[in-house]
A protein has these predicted regions:
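Conserved small/polar residues in nucleotide/adenosyl-binding loops
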Residues: 173-178
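NAD(P)H-binding glycine-rich loop region in Rossmannoid oxidoreductase-like domains
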Residues: 53-96, 127
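Conserved Rossmann-fold NAD(P)-dependent oxidoreductase catalytic core, especially the SDR/UDP-sugar
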Residues: 101-147, 168
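N-terminal Rossmann NAD(P)H-binding glycine-rich loop of SDR-like oxidoreductase domains
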Residues: 6-24
Length: 178
């Protein structure tokens, strides 16, 4: 059975991803803080791990222990992140630095997945053309205008420079369309 880790699994999107992974037959691991609500993670088949992203060395040791006990994950969906904060430095610490720490720790611990999916945001492109309202295209330059968007772009760019690491970047956005 293939194993998947979903970070940020306690949130709305993460909880949905965990349920979908179970439905598809994956051994599903939810990366959540010990203080996080697990209301969206009630299925008894979900396994939990509390990863310490902020300390790369500790995270590497934690993942190496995981690999010895359970083997590596086949897939990682990195959905953990910060969307609101009073201190803008937290965007960069959580969204960019913790992403880099996770990628480095996965590689260094022998836990590099077959595929790593970074859940990012259309905010990494900025507002787009507000005169013509032309939809944003992946060919457009990324010009984020918020610290949140800038931190997501920093994480994307870090990942793009890791040629040894198999990844996909998923851009999420909200729509008011019915």
């Amino acid at each position: 059975m293939k194993k998947i880790l979903i970070t940020g699994a306690s949130g709305f999107i993460g909880g949905f991803l965990a349920k979908e992974a179970l439905n598809r037959g994956y051994e599903t691991w939810a990366g959540v803080r010990s203080t996080s609500s697990r209301v969206n993670l009630q299925d008894e088949r979900i396994r939990f791990i509390d990863l310490k992203y902020s300390d790369r060395e500790s995270l590497t040791a934690q993942l190496a222990d995981f690999v010895r006990e359970h083997g590596p994950w086949d897939y990682v969906i990195h959905n953990a992140g910060l969307t609101k904060t009073l201190d803008k430095r937290n965007f960069y610490r959580i969204n960019a630095q913790n992403t880099a720490n996770l990628i480095e720790a996965l590689a260094a611990s022998g836990c590099k997945p077959e595929k790593f999916l970074l859940m990012s945001s259309l905010s990494s492109y900025g507002r787009g053309d507000e005169k013509t309202f032309r939809p944003i295209s992946l060919d457009d330059p990324q010009l984020p205008d918020t610290d949140y968007g800038k931190s997501k772009l920093e994480a994307e760019n870090y990942l793009r420079h890791q040629s040894y690491f198999p990844y996909v970047i998923c851009l999420l956005y909200t729509s008011d369309a019915a």
